[in-house]
């Protein structure tokens, strides 16, 4: 963000380059330095669990420009999102052609603006803001899904271009299948309907069966090539063409995961993906943020890690509302058969995603195709009065604001690579208290003081570094003059003379913030054991918290970190910009 560098790698994106290089050698292995912990390990060999399509794309890119090895993540993700926007714009245009109530001016306005709403007012904004190894595969999978939907619906709307649409369908199916398996589900389910519709159209025009078969040979060959490559990819990793994954070979035990899919997860998934809660709102501009997933039945989900989401009812309301109306309309009103089939196929995909053992923002992108088809139905049958168009415009602007700002805020808290100039400007907008704390030139920071010699606890406390020895970093600032601490640790300082208050910023480490039910508390005590401050932290509030406390009359401050509830493996937290401020 803010650097405008198109050719730039992101987290583990180089793993696709590694896979591409090894594919030329006839193997699906990946260098462990490239994939790190996001890997399968089978008989001492390292593999990735992501689809190989981004690696196939890199075969071409690294051949053309080998000097940019490892730098394609951003370009690849941007290309996938751009092609998704193109497909969506064409879907909207095709749907509006069926609606005689829409003026040519309104049709042009919707066709041109809808791709921007999809890109910036849905989870795609989050994917493109962090084009890491996870998001790149998801972006290409979603891209393929949208193009298969376009080809499917155009068989009914533009039957004269059916041969072209069949080729698009076949290529897009391959992109889906080789990017992310679940994104290929709609195309796989629609495939029989698409081929039957094509044969029927050809038969109605009197085409001979042999000629029809010859025309189908190209799309069938493309589909077959994709399937064969995926089966080889399975065999190369697991020794079986039927094994698409094996979580027993993953870096944490499968016993933490439970079953892969369960209907009992649907209520929790619906609440996290679509529910409204005050957790998504903050008191400072832009007033929205992502929130850590909450589960009523946490035993059904991954126990070792949780991520953050923002409700689609906020971040994509322009799509959710008319998409749901269009889907419901198709249940009892006349509707194109392929549109109904597409709704059923994408609904099945969405249900599978919501029955999975993990909920996160990138998976929300797989819910988008269902609402896209519903929106196409809505635009093709409803009279679009000025009020509807105004509502679409307002909700699109609102969704873009929520999606973009929440993605930026998440990137900042995650210390994502953002240009220093942009970081500084955003900090004063999103976190003014913290920006002011970092800039405080009159304070005495604890890292400038020498701890009292007999005060440190046996547990580790690291000035200016976290517990893994890395420099403390917060919102792009590094170093931030703080303490990396583990539960059970404490450290004491002599309070400088003429000190009025102690100020600090508390935050769970990234590892602790993702754990289930992490609950830690920073406490400060004076030389008499009296409580000076108490700042609790838990995994439901993963953002930094600024606090202060008076230390007037005290000569010594002991800072400690402890578990507030039952002890867990996630027990690391940091104090940033910990400082004593003088009397005014």
Please describe what each predicted stretch is.
Residues 1-440:
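Membrane-proximal envelope and lipid/glycan-remodeling enzymes
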């Amino acid at each position: 963000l803010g650097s405008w560098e198109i050719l730039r790698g992101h987290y583990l994106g180089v793993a696709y380059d590694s896979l591409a290089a090894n594919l030329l050698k006839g193997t699906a292995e990946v260098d462990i330095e490239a994939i790190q912990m996001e890997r399968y390990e089978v008989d001492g060999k390292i593999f990735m669990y992501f689809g190989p399509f981004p690696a196939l794309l890199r075969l071409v890119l690294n051949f053309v420009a080998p000097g940019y090895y490892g730098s394609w993540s951003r370009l690849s993700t941007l290309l996938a999102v751009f092609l998704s926007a193109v497909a969506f714009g064409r879907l909207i245009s095709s749907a509006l052609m069926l609606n005689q109530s829409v003026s040519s001016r309104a049709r042009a306005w919707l066709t041109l603006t809808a791709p921007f709403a999809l890109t910036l007012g849905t989870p795609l904004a989050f994917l493109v803001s962090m084009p890491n190894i996870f998001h790149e595969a998801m972006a290409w999978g979603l891209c393929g899904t949208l193009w298969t939907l376009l080809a499917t619906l155009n068989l009914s709307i533009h039957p004269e271009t059916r041969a072209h649409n069949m080729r698009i369908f076949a290529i897009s199916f391959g992109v889906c299948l080789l990017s992310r398996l679940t994104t290929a589900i709609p195309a796989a389910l629609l495939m029989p309907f698409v081929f039957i519709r094509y044969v029927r159209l050809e038969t109605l025009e009197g085409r001979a069966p042999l000629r029809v078969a010859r025309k189908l040979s190209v799309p069938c060959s493309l589909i077959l090539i994709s399937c064969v490559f995926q089966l080889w990819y399975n065999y190369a990793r697991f020794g079986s063409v039927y094994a698409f994954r094996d979580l027993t070979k993953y870096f944490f035990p499968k016993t933490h995961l439970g079953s892969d899919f369960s209907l009992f997860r649907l209520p929790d998934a619906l609440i996290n993906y679509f529910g409204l809660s005050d957790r998504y709102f903050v008191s400072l501009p832009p007033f929205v943020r992502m929130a850590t997933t909450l589960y009523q039945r946490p035993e059904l989900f991954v126990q070792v890690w949780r991520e953050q989401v923002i409700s689609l009812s906020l971040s994509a309301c322009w799509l959710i509302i008319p998409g749901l109306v269009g889907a419901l309309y198709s249940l009892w009103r006349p509707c194109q058969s392929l549109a109904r089939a597409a709704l059923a196929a994408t609904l099945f995909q969405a249900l599978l995603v919501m029955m999975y053992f993990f909920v996160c923002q990138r998976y929300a992108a797989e819910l988008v195709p269902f609402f896209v088809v519903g929106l196409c139905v809505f635009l093709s049958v409803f009279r679009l009065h000025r009020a509807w168009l105004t509502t679409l415009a307002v909700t699109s602007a609102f969704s873009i604001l929520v999606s973009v700002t929440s993605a930026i805020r998440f990137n900042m808290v995650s210390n994502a690579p953002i240009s220093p100039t942009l970081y500084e400007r955003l900090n004063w907008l999103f976190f003014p208290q913290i920006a002011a704390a970092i800039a405080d030139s009159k304070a005495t920071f604890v890292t400038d003081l020498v701890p009292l010699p007999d005060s440190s606890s046996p547990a580790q406390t690291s000035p200016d570094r976290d517990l893994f020895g890395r420099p403390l970093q917060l919102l792009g600032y590094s170093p931030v003059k703080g303490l990396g601490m583990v539960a059970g640790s404490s450290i004491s300082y002599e309070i400088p003379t003429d000190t009025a208050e102690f100020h600090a910023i508390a935050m769970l480490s990234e590892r602790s913030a993702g754990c289930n039910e992490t609950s830690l508390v920073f406490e400060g005590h004076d030389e008499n054991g009296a409580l000076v401050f108490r700042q609790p932290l838990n995994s439901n509030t993963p953002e930094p918290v600024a606090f202060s406390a008076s230390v007037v009359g005290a000569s010594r401050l002991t800072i400690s970190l402890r578990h507030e509830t039952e002890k867990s493996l996630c027990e690391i937290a940091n104090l940033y910009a910990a400082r004593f401020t003088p009397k005014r």
